[in-house]
């Protein structure tokens, strides 16, 4: 079974706390890929921290809040890629 996750992230200062990294790295045991959708700008350090557990990081403007982020994350996966996934898990940092 192939599982993927879309993790929605927002921090007004773009800081990635340790618990975020721990969450992502621990879920990699269960998820084949994790796309992080950031609704806030990230610097290189924050991006690198997210990539410790994520397979991809996508930054976007904070429009549409969480739902807009999930929508854009699903669009980034694309229908062909989604068709190869058995389960898609949408989750966030709270």
Where are the regions a protein language model picked out?
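Short internal beta-strands
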Residues: 34-39
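Well-ordered, non-membrane alpha-helical segments in soluble/globular domains
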Residues: 17-24, 71
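N-proximal low-complexity "stem/linker" segments adjacent to membrane-targeting elements
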Residues: 1-18
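Conserved acidic residues
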Residues: 3, 32, 55, 86
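Short glycine-centered, acidic/aromatic-flanked micro-motifs in structured strand/loop junctions
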Residues: 7-10, 59-60, 93
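Active-site-proximal specificity loops/subdomain of glycosyltransferases
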Residues: 42-85
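Short, acidic, metal-binding catalytic loop of nucleotide-sugar glycosyltransferases
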Residues: 22-33
